[in-house]
UniProtKB/Swiss-Prot annotation:
Tissue: Expressed in liver.
Enzyme class per UniProt: transferase
Activity regulation behaviour: Inhibited by Co(2+), Zn(2+), Cd(2+) and Pb(2+) ions. Inactivated by Hg(2+) and Cu(2+) ions.
Gene: sult1st2
Family per record: Belongs to the sulfotransferase 1 family.
Organism of provenance: Danio rerio
Record field: temperature dependence: Active from 20 to 43 degrees Celsius.
Organism lineage string: Eukaryota, Metazoa, Chordata, Craniata, Vertebrata
GO cellular component: cytoplasm
One Gene Ontology biological process: sulfation
Name listed for the protein in its UniProt record: Cytosolic sulfotransferase 2
Function: Sulfotransferase that utilizes 3'-phospho-5'-adenylyl sulfate (PAPS) as sulfonate donor to catalyze the sulfate conjugation of a variety of xenobiotic and endogenous compounds, including 2-naphthol, hydroxychlorobiphenyls, T3 (triiodo-L-thyronine), T4 (thyroxine), estrone and DOPA.
pH effects: Optimum pH is 4.75 and 10.5. These two pH optima may correspond to two distinct conformational states of the enzyme.
Length: 301
C-alpha cells in the first residue's frame, strides 16, 4: 500500500471549542458522532485510550509491532501509524473517517485509538468486553506537550501564549475536556471493568521493556524475550521521531517548522516551562481537583 496522499487536505481556519455533552470538543471530533456513538466493537478489539499527548502513538506502535511486526512487516514501511491504528472519532475533510478506517481494518485484532473521556466511549466496547489500554501522563508534562502540539496543529484551537494555555488547561478548557476528569474517569472505570490496563507514561520512559512485558501479560501474548527486546529498541523515542510512518510528518495539518509532533518524549520537561508562580498555582488547583482520587503520578523519574 502506498503512503496516502493528503496534500489536498486543507483547513480554512483553526476550529473553535464547543461544549459537547459537557466536554470541550471541536467539530473535527463530533461531526461524525452518530457513527462514533453506534460503532460496533468486537470482543478482540483493543482500544488505546489516552488524554492527548500522553503516549498514544507510542503504545499504538508497540501494539502494532507485537501483533503484526512479524506476520506483516511491510506494514511498518508502507502505512503511517494513523492508518494502521484508526483514530475513532476523527472527522477531517480530506481524511478517511476514523469509524470507516476502523470498520475496514483487515487485521485481527483491530487496534483502535481514542481520546474520548470514558463516559463518551461507544458502549459496544464495554458490552463486547473489549480490552482497553489506557495511558496516563503527569499533568505538568502533559500540559507542556499539549501546548506545543496546539501550536503546530492547525486542526486545534489557537493556544495563545504558554500562560494563557496553562490557565485554560487548569480550567479544563481543552479539546477532550479536563485532564483531571479524563485520568480519573478511566481509573474509576478500572475498579468495575477488569479489562482495562492502566499504564503510566513515566513508567514507560523509565523501563520500556518492563512495560512491554506488562502489555504482553495483559493481552495474553507469549512473546519471546528476544522479540520483546527487539520491539523495545524499535520504539525508542529517537527512533520513532525519525520514522516517517510514526512521526506524523505525512499529515499537512501539522506545521513541523513550529514544533515536531514528537518533540522531546521526556519526563520533567515542565521545569523548563513553569515559572515558580505558575507551579504554585498549578499545585493548588491540582490538589483541589485530585483530592478524591487514589491515582498517583510522578513528575520526575
Amino acid at each position: 500500500m502506498e503512503i496516502p496522499d493528503f496534500s489536498s487536505m486543507k483547513l480554512d481556519s483553526r476550529p473553535e471549542l464547543i461544549d459537547f455533552e459537557g466536554v470541550s470538543m471541536t467539530r473535527y471530533f463530533t461531526d461524525n458522532w452518530e457513527k462514533v456513538k453506534n460503532f460496533q466493537a468486537r470482543p478482540d478489539d483493543i482500544l488505546i485510550a489516552t488524554y492527548p499527548k500522553a503516549g498514544t502513538t507510542w503504545v499504538s506502535y508497540i501494539l502494532d509491532l507485537l501483533y503484526f511486526g512479524n506476520e506483516s512487516p511491510e506494514r511498518q514501511t508502507s502505512q503511517p501509524i494513523y492508518m494502521r491504528v484508526p483514530f475513532l472519532e476523527m472527522c477531517f475533510q480530506g481524511l478517511p473517517l476514523g469509524t470507516e478506517l476502523a470498520d475496514t481494518l483487515p487485521t485481527s485484532p483491530r487496534p483502535i485509538k481514542t481520546h474520548l473521556p470514558v463516559q463518551l466511549v461507544p458502549k459496544s466496547f464495554w458490552e463486547q468486553n473489549s480490552k482497553v489500554v489506557y495511558v496516563a501522563r503527569n499533568a505538568k508534562d502533559n500540559a507542556v506537550s499539549y501546548f506545543h502540539f496546539d501550536r503546530m496543529n492547525m486542526g486545534q484551537p489557537e493556544p495563545g501564549d504558554w500562560n494563557t494555555f496553562l490557565q485554560k488547561f487548569m480550567d479544563g478548557r481543552n479539546v477532550f475536556g479536563p485532564w483531571y476528569d479524563h485520568v480519573n474517569g478511566y481509573w474509576k472505570k478500572k475498579q468495575t471493568y477488569s479489562n482495562i490496563l492502566y499504564m503510566f507514561y513515566e513508567d514507560m520512559v523509565e523501563d520500556t521493556g518492563r512495560e512491554v512485558a506488562r502489555l504482553c501479560s495483559f493481552l495474553g501474548l507469549s512473546t519471546s524475550a528476544t522479540e520483546r527486546e527487539r520491539i523495545t529498541k524499535g520504539v525508542q523515542f529517537d527512533v520513532m521521531k525519525q520514522n516517517k510512518m510514526t512521526n506524523y510528518s505525512t499529515l499537512p495539518v501539522m506545521d513541523f517548522k513550529i514544533s515536531p509532533f514528537m518533540r522531546k518524549g521526556k519526563v520533567g520537561d515542565w521545569r523548563n516551562h513553569f515559572t515558580v508562580a505558575q507551579n504554585e498555582q498549578f499545585d493548588e488547583v491540582y490538589k483541589q481537583k485530585m483530592k478524591n482520587t487514589t491515582v498517583k503520578f510522578r513528575t520526575e523519574i
